[in-house]
């Protein structure tokens, strides 16, 4: 057992050296948030990344918590094309749950495990200027990112904090917007020009003919979408990945957040456990 431990450390060493001082944006959601064991493992992984000299920036979701509170209040959640239809009352609930509960729970868990986290949302420091998402008609206060101001994030990283970001943006008139967490993570990753964007999902990665694809170029990822090989919720995640790598992010990783220590297994091992998207042509 001791020799196995040494071997694991030796395998991780070149990656620790390579990524020391680099910034990763990690989208935390899905199974990793719902499964308590996976959640605790993720928090421990995060703190370990920080202690190895990597700068993690967390963007979180919280859809199940929002729906749970809505149901308790007698409000039925309604979705259109994967987006939560967000009227004024729903927007209040979304902001209350994401900013007031989910964000602070994550921050406290990181701090309890030896990290130093600060929770913010897109309104803080004018981080996420948003505008109404109209692609699928009027779906209420659902937004898309218009501009990212990374000043606050950079300041927190310099001071040694782990930023934890709730995906609530603000309009030019001060209106609050609910924004998809994958999109927020990708836009922040692009603005910071980070080393890695990691998207935690409920599946092991991207599949073709029943087989996990460990690595894809952005062109190959585009082909999978165009040929209808990937479907459902994986399409917007791949679109985020393609946009990120085409805008300067070195690589994007789509991994199963329900697997304990998925983050470390993907980043610090040769094989990884999910799908990595990068510009292989460069």
Swiss-Prot record:
Its EC number is 2.7.2.8. GO terms for cellular component: cytoplasm. Pathway: Amino-acid biosynthesis; L-arginine biosynthesis; N(2)-acetyl-L-ornithine from L-glutamate: step 2/4. It holds the Pfam family AA_kinase. It catalyses: N-acetyl-L-glutamate + ATP = N-acetyl-L-glutamyl 5-phosphate + ADP. GO terms for biological process: arginine biosynthetic process via ornithine; L-arginine biosynthetic process. CDD domains: AAK_NAGK-C (cd04250). Disulfide bonds: none annotated. One of its GO terms (molecular function) is ATP binding. Substrate binds at residues 62-63, 84, 178. Keywords: Amino-acid biosynthesis, Arginine biosynthesis, ATP-binding, Cytoplasm, Kinase, Nucleotide-binding, Transferase. It is found in: Cytoplasm. Its main location: cytoplasm. The record marks 27, 237 as: Transition state stabilizer. It comes from the Bacteria. InterPro entries: AceGlu_kinase-like_sf (IPR036393), AcgluKinase_fam (IPR004662), ArgB (IPR037528), Asp/Glu/Uridylate_kinase (IPR001048), NAGK-C (IPR041727). HAMAP family: ArgB. Catalyzes the ATP-dependent phosphorylation of N-acetyl-L-glutamate. Belongs to the acetylglutamate kinase family. ArgB subfamily. This is Acetylglutamate kinase. The lineage of its organism: Bacteria, Thermotogati, Thermotogota, Thermotogae, Kosmotogales. The gene is argB.
